[in-house]
């Protein structure tokens, strides 16, 4: 998360979370189009790190990195802690615009088991979304595994209606008001990236996720990832919100394992706002000693030019 904090109160923030694989130091998503209220004096940033072998670094120290905030190098941190990944709120979005195959149905059952049993994420922190005709729908929340929810996914196509972006907005709004306010929140999207009927645009879906502090991880259900507009949309959704894009072919459980591994080595750092200059503050995290360390986060935060 990158968020200016007022001295006496913490305002809503948006997350900057890191994921593994093929990244360079400080890679981030698109510029958020939001402002904060005035009198903010502190920035909080959530991130993760990997080593040269693409493994999460669980022993990171505050001296191992520096933050570059709008060209100001920050090494004097107010706080530095490991994130509590057991509070993770996970939502899964299933693109049901086409028939959900028996294989995918089985994979969803495995995913629910992985999240609840193997990863130790409480059942109440898990929800499942899908399309119901042209409308977003919540299949379950808090009892997905007990209700065998994966078996109740629609077995027939939604007649070409694909409200993907609307469903992302719907799920992000749900997560924003659900669970621990300080919990990291992630929406895992299983889709081909196509949208045929949403009122919301791709940009509005990204904005909704950022405003709700939800990051998107997208598992591409296309047969081939390259040259597809849907794949490009999924890459945009993931990249702009600090998540990760998983190209085909790939297994659902395998992708979730990678996502969960990332949260086990995530951190939160806070520092005094280095500049009250209005506008976009680009943020990067760079290694100070081990140049093989790599960090990934969103691009920064937007500071207001007037009192809101």
Map each language-model feature to its residues:
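Residue-level recognition of conserved structural "scaffold" positions that shape functional pockets
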Residues: 2, 15-18, 200
């Amino acid at each position: 998360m990158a968020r200016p904090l007022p001295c006496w109160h913490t305002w809503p923030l948006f997350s900057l979370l890191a994921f593994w694989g093929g990244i360079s130091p400080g890679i981030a998503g698109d510029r958020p189009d939001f402002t904060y209220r005035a009198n903010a004096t502190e920035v909080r940033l959530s991130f993760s790190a990997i080593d040269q072998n693409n493994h999460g670094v669980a022993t990171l120290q505050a001296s191992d990195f520096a933050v570059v905030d709008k060209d100001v190098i920050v090494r004097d941190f107010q706080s530095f802690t490991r994130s509590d990944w057991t509070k993770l709120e996970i939502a899964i979005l299933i693109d049901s615009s086409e028939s959900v195959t028996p294989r995918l149905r089985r994979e969803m059952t495995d995913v629910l088991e992985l999240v609840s049993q193997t990863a130790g994420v409480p059942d109440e922190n898990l929800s499942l979304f899908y399309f119901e005709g042209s409308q977003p729908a919540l299949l379950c929340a808090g009892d997905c595994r007990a209700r065998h929810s994966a078996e109740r996914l629609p077995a027939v196509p939604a007649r070409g209606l694909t409200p993907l972006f609307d469903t992302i907005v719907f799920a992000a709004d749900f997560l924003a008001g659900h669970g621990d306010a300080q919990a990291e929140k992630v929406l895992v999207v299983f889709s081909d990236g196509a949208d045929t009927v949403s009122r919301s645009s791709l940009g509005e879906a990204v904005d909704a996720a950022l405003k709700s502090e939800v990051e998107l991880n997208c598992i591409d259900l296309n047969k081939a990832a390259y040259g597809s507009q849907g794949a490009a949309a999924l890459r945009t959704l993931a990249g702009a919100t600090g998540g990760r894009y998983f190209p085909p072919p790939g297994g659902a459980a395998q992708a979730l394992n990678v996502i969960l591994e990332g949260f086990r080595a995530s951190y939160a750092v806070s520092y005094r706002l280095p500049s009250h200059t209005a506008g976009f503050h680009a943020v990067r995290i760079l290694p100070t000693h081990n140049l093989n360390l790599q960090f990934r986060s969103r691009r920064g935060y937007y500071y207001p030019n007037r009192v809101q």
